């Protein structure tokens, strides 16, 4: 069931949240009672449009808070609230006294760890200890300090499901966001959402509107195929918008999630049986080739990949950056038979250079760390130029493959402009709305191609690899632009 969690101060605030919940498909509304007086609580309990969970969290225990919690739980029970959620730390005596008064209300007995996710053995012990007190549902929620922490929760759910225990379990925090979806898909009874990103009752909650409209949460089933993106950071990524809309458009039983990770090998080891395919972004496009994989001759020649499918748990690698950029080169004649400077020496730079070589370009590469530019130039059989020395020649085209708005990049373009004016600047950084590079080009009336065009071009190929289906470029492009400022 989908829960909208909210902490109102007044009945009026509650009514706004209730309306939002009804409009966006909530099954339950969790009312946090810490800030409510008795009069407002009674008004809320009398409103029956949505079933409710009454919850009272105590962060720092005191006699007055425990007394207030006890009083409000009793009011909720006496008014036949559908669920109460009681933290096991309130103790057996507190819980059993309330249980004696319960008639129609269902009990959720919960455990929270706001600092870390214990190891699986300890999580099992916590569940076993909780089950010594009879309840309708048990809840174990922990804080994720890495994406890997979600794996322990998934294994705990697997054990609970086998025992027939109704368990609500997921990780909180930024690293627990995608784990919430995996938990719900793999048997967690409830999915908790927020009113909006500013009114979360727990860190890592996602707004109900985004859950409903982007992720189609009501259509997340055990059979749903999971895709996602690995990299760090991922705040700038819009792949979740593109692919989830694509799945909706094509009626695919699939979902796409963000996985901000530090170690791709470790992530693949733990999650390869939960995920069907991945997009790969900075900083792992080159590193991913070091892992055991199945890949084509082109992937090996480029030296980077941005897409992965799992077949019998084995990763198959693709490079849709190459396919997408090649399309841009075909459309833009200035990217053919030109003298081109590529800025950057990572996986995207490799892909761009490989594509440009197919169209008779004279290619030079530079990078903040010149040694990396020299190494890449030697490998790709092109020329490296030192960004700190005077350039010996002019450039027809400049292509940026690095994350935008850094001082090195802007100062480098200013240096180029002091010597000559390129005919075209291509900025592969996705954040085109705030690109200082593109703004500088506009001032000098230089033609540009922005990173959004590149993103869409490669994502279309990626979607085809994931689903075997083509997608309407016009529709998906419009959707991503319309929802561009949404965050996951």
Predicted region positions:
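Active-site-adjacent beta->alpha loops and helix N-cap segments on the catalytic face
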Residues: 35-47, 88-102, 118-121, 145-157
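Glycine-rich adenosine-cofactor-binding loop
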Residues: 171, 227-233, 321, 329, ...
């Amino acid at each position: 069931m989908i829960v909208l969690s909210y902490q109102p101060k007044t009945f009026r605030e509650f009514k706004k949240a209730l309306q939002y919940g009804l409009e966006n498909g909530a099954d339950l509304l969790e009312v946090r009672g810490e800030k409510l007086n008795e009069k407002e609580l009674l008004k809320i309990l009398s409103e029956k449009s949505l079933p409710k969970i009454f919850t009272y969290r105590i962060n720092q225990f005191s006699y007055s808070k425990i007394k207030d919690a006890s009083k409000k739980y009793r009011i909720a029970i006496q008014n036949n609230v559908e669920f109460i959620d009681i933290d096991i730390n309130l103790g057996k005596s507190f819980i059993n006294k309330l249980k004696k008064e319960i008639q129609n209300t269902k009990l959720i007995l919960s455990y929270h760890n706001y600092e870390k996710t214990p190891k699986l053995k300890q999580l099992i012990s916590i569940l076993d200890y909780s089950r010594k007190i009879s309840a309708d549902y048990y809840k174990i929620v922990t804080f994720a300090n890495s994406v890997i922490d979600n794996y322990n929760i998934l294994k705990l759910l697997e054990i609970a499901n086998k025992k027939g225990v109704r368990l609500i379990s997921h990780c909180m925090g930024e690293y627990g966001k995608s784990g919430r979806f995996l938990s719900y898909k793999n048997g967690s009874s409830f999915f908790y959402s927020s009113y909006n990103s500013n009114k979360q009752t727990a860190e890592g909650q996602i707004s109900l509107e985004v859950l409903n409209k982007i992720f189609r949460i009501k259509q997340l089933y055990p059979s749903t195929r999971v895709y996602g993106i690995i990299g760090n950071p991922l705040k700038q990524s819009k792949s979740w918008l593109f692919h989830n809309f694509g799945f909706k458009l094509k009626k695919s039983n699939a979902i796409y999630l963000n996985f901000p990770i530090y170690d791709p090998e470790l992530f693949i080891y733990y999650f390869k049986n939960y995920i069907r395919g991945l997009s790969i972004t900075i900083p792992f496009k080159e590193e991913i080739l070091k892992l055991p994989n199945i890949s084509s001759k082109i992937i090996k020649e480029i030296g980077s990949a941005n897409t992965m499918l799992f077949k019998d748990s084995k990763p198959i690698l693709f490079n849709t950056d190459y396919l997408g950029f090649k399309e841009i080169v075909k459309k833009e004649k200035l990217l053919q038979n030109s003298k081109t400077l590529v800025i950057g020496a990572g996986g995207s730079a490799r892909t761009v250079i490989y594509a440009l070589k197919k169209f008779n370009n004279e290619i030079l590469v530079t990078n903040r760390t010149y040694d990396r530019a020299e190494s890449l130039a030697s490998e790709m059989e092109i020329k490296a130029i030192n960004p700190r020395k005077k350039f010996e020649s002019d450039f027809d085209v400049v292509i940026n493959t690095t994350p935008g708005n850094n001082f090195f990049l802007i100062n480098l373009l200013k240096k180029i402009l002091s010597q000559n004016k390129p005919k075209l600047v291509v900025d592969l950084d996705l954040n085109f709305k705030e690109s200082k590079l593109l703004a500088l080009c506009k001032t000098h009336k230089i033609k540009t191609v922005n990173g959004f065009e590149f993103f869409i071009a490669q994502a279309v190929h990626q979607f085809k690899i994931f689903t075997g289906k083509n997608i309407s470029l016009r529709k998906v492009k419009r959707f991503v632009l319309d929802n561009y400022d949404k965050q996951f």
